[in-house]
Amino acid sequence: DLFLHDKTIAMRCRDVGVLSKDDALKLCTVGPTARASGVNVDLRQDYPYCAYGDLEVRAILPDQYAGETRGDVYDRIVVRLLEVGQSCGIIRQCISEMPAGEITAEPKLAKLLAICKKARGEAIGRVEAPRGECFHYVLMEGKEAPHAWKVKASSYSNLMSWIPMLRGEQIADIPIIVASIDPCLSCTDRVAVVKMGSRSILSKEDLHRLSVEKTRRLQQ
């Protein structure tokens, strides 16, 4: 509450880096980035896996806290903060409802892993990671190593959302807009060819200075 009621944070984050619900759906965003734009999506409620089918997990949307959804940096902060509390609640529920017995159900994990390594076939895995849906595809051909393994991390699904978020915004707002989707750049390692007529480079110090200057202007 102390963070969410801070006037300076509201001034810097409200109506900045807006991602509409329509754009969020068109760009196939996932996780808190999608939910902050009003998209009611969460694999734990939509396609429950593991124990989630027995737990009370529902997608957190900004209007549950603020009574409205703007899809801005502030809403993305709200969703992430509320999801911290939700995670604590899930842990408490798991502890209170966990059945008695051994922690690991499979007594011979090494044997199980050996069988899995020699498996044949293909499968997919989908989980709701902190940044959204993480998708894995694996193809096994009876050898110890997978024949094919492809991963689509949640940050990769959210990168395109920067386009509408950043369009028309001030340079001073770039750091908070980029950070608002909590990007894991190592999860999005790809090759890209970029062609441009000219370019300029802003250092970390330049971005920090511009951000501080804008905050001070708003406080005047």
Where are these regions (language model features)?
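Active-site bordering "gate/hinge" segments
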Residues: 1-220
